Amino acid sequence: MKYNRVIPGVFLKRPNRFIAHVCINGKEEVCHVKNTGRCKELLVPGCTVYCAVSDNPNRKTKFDLIAVEKKVENHEGDADQNTTASDDKNALLANHKNEFETDTVLLINMDSQAPNAAVKEWLASGASPFGQIDLLKPECSHGNSRFDFYLECNKRKIFIEVKGVTLEDDGVVLFPDAPTERGVKHVHELIQCHGEGYETYILFVVQMERARYFTPNRKTHPEFADALYEAKQAGVELLAYMCTVSPDEMKLDKPLKIKL
């Protein structure tokens, strides 16, 4: 999936989960954050972010914050890891070059709507493991459940639930980044659908280009990790895919190993 106009900026602060203050072209702008999650490990004052320009003149905010460069620690000399970020905008901008531009960075798309859009393109293109699809229905209801995708191909009937992954720790990517009762509910509903004869998949879309493997975040939400293991045992298929990511585009790329 592709964005029309994207420009870089320097993240300053996030007063609430909906907006962030970003320095764009030397001016402090209020941007809509397209991810209501905590994202504290991503939105570090002074980091480089990327914002899509909105074409809607009636919006309160002109920009959508969609991607961020995360500094990847090399574990050699951790002395500057504990540097306290100043609340002063000028200090943040002055530190930006020294702290971020000289380190290895990982570009992460943090738009919570991007995974479903990218998966829809991937499925429709015929490049997925499902091949050519006869019927593709996003946001499909089934009983009391609602799944991200329903598809039919070669007489197969398939439900897919998509989860976007932005949390990375030393090359390991994890989901969720916060407790998700809704996520547990989705897993149990897929187990039920599998029992009814449908093929069922949970697809973790890793919104970055580099990772060693995916694993459920048991420390943050053990119930989700347990539900995922139960689903695997019941026959629900688990998939994880890395993406190619640029400031203005994200596409599904290579499968990634899963460790439960």
Question: What are the functions of these language-model segments?
Answer:
Residues 164, 171-181, 188-220, 242:
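Nucleic-acid nuclease catalytic cores
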Residues 40, 74-76, 84-97, 105-136:
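Acidic-basic catalytic patches of nuclease active cores, encompassing PD-(D/E)XK
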Residues 17-21:
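Short aromatic-glycine-enriched beta-strand elements
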Residues 37-50:
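Short nucleic-acid-contacting surface segments enriched for D/E, G, S/T with interspersed K/R
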Residues 29-39:
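Short alpha-helix capping/helix-loop boundary micro-motifs
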Residues 9, 147-176, 190:
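Conserved catalytic cores of phosphodiester-cleaving nucleases, focusing on short active-site segments
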Residues 207-260:
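Domain-level recognition of nuclease-like catalytic cores that cleave nucleotide substrates
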